[in-house]
Design a protein with these regions (language model features):
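Leucine-rich repeat
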Residues: 1-219
């Protein structure tokens, strides 16, 4: 497990700056972790990363990645990319609104998720993944998660326990506006299909935040 946590801006109105090295077009830290992680069975990371964590940039001279032994993947990513751009967009309700980013930014989040989806195609024994971002205290979390049959989820569902299900499970906590593009959607549906069959429970879940009173709000 690696924790390189960097607090997201509490005030979404703040101007964010790039942390990329001068002259580089992708995050060298993310790319290095991608190379390192390919020998792991469990990869848990809380960090400030970009798409090269999952897939090489066109500016890299690297072979196609592969995670032949990876069973558990949990990535907590910052809502601001290393380039300084937000993975999310939103409009403040008024001049006092400091946390309004809440919908996926097609220009930044989609390429990040496409890289993630492509990476899952190279994880043949993956049993679970959680890709999450805490956007803000009130806004809550953006999450995508998958569990193979018999693998316990990271939280309890409000409508009942599906951990005993004999099929794969794919969950989205992404708000009411953003939806995955067709490639991401279809690729994530294929995770574990070859090992466990085509049956799949797929759900879009409700809002989860630290301020919510729902049981779904806590792991």
């Amino acid at each position: 497990m690696f924790n390189f946590h960097q607090e997201a801006p509490f005030d979404h109105r703040e101007v964010t700056s790039s942390s990329l090295l001068q002259g580089t077009l992708f995050d060298l830290f993310s790319a290095s972790l991608r190379v390192f992680s390919q020998n792991l069975t469990t990869f848990i990371l809380d960090a400030y990363v970009d798409a090269t964590l999952f897939w090489p940039s066109i500016h890299e001279s690297r072979a196609m990645p592969s995670w032949p032994s990876l069973k558990k993947l949990k990535i907590s990513f910052n809502p601001v990319a290393p380039s300084g751009t937000w993975y999310f967009v939103g409009t403040p309700k008024d001049e006092e609104d400091t946390q309004f980013m809440q919908h996926g930014n097609r220009d930044t989040l989609d390429p990040f998720l496409i890289a993630f989806a492509k990476a899952t195609q190279q994880m043949p024994v993956l049993e679970s993944f959680m890709l999450e971002c805490e956007i803000g205290y009130e806004v809550g979390f953006f999450e995508l998660s998958y569990y193979a049959p018999g693998v316990k989820a990271d939280w309890s569902l409000d409508w009942g326990d599906e951990d005993a299900a004999t099929v794969r499970r794919l969950y989205y906590t992404v708000g009411d506006v953003w939806r995955p593009d067709a490639f991401v959607e279809e690729t994530l549906r294929d995770v574990g299909r070859e090992r466990h069959g085509p049956e799949l429970i797929e759900r879009f879940l409700g809002h989860r935040s630290w301020s919510s009173q729902s049981a779904w709000s806590w792991f």
